[in-house]
Every structure is written in C-alpha cells, then in structure tokens.
C-alpha cells in the first residue's frame, strides 16, 4: 500500500510539472509545443484517474452490494 501511495504522489507531482511546462510553452514560437504539453498533461491525468479507479472501484462496488450476495 505504501508503494501505491508513493507512485500516486509521483504521478501527481509529474503531472503538475508537465502542466507548468505546458502553460509556459505557449509563449514559444512553435505552435506544436502547447499541443504536445497538453497531450502530456492529459496522459498523466488519465494515468492518475485510472490508478485511483483501479484501487477504489472494487471496494466501492462491493460496499454497495448486500453482504449475503458476496460469496468468496
């Protein structure tokens, strides 16, 4: 569980760093750089969302079911 927390924290920090890079690159002369930075931000946001969904979705689904319907 500790490694998942560290991994999620690193993903958040990297996404913030890429967001800063993407917002700062809009002043560059190349028109493809802001789009590239936005794609990086979207990829990191999707990675964070999928990691959170992978961790919390099974618990959330089984918590909605009645206890007697869950068989192990």
Curated annotation (Swiss-Prot):
Residues 50-72 are cytoplasmic. Its main location: membrane. Residues 1-22 form the signal peptide. Keywords: Membrane, Signal, Transmembrane, Transmembrane helix. Residues 23-28 are extracellular. It is found in: Membrane. The chain crosses the membrane at residues 29-49. The keyword Disulfide bond does not apply. The keyword Kinase does not apply. GO terms for cellular component: membrane. It is a single-pass membrane protein. This is Putative uncharacterized transmembrane protein DDB_G0287329.
């Amino acid at each position: 569980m500790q490694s998942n927390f560290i991994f999620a924290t690193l993903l958040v920090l990297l996404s913030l760093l890429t967001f800063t890079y993407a917002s700062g690159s809009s002043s560059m002369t190349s028109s493809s750089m802001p789009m590239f930075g936005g794609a990086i931000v979207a990829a990191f946001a999707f990675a964070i969302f999928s990691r959170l969904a992978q961790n919390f979705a099974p618990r959330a689904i089984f918590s909605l079911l009645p206890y007697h319907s869950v068989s192990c």
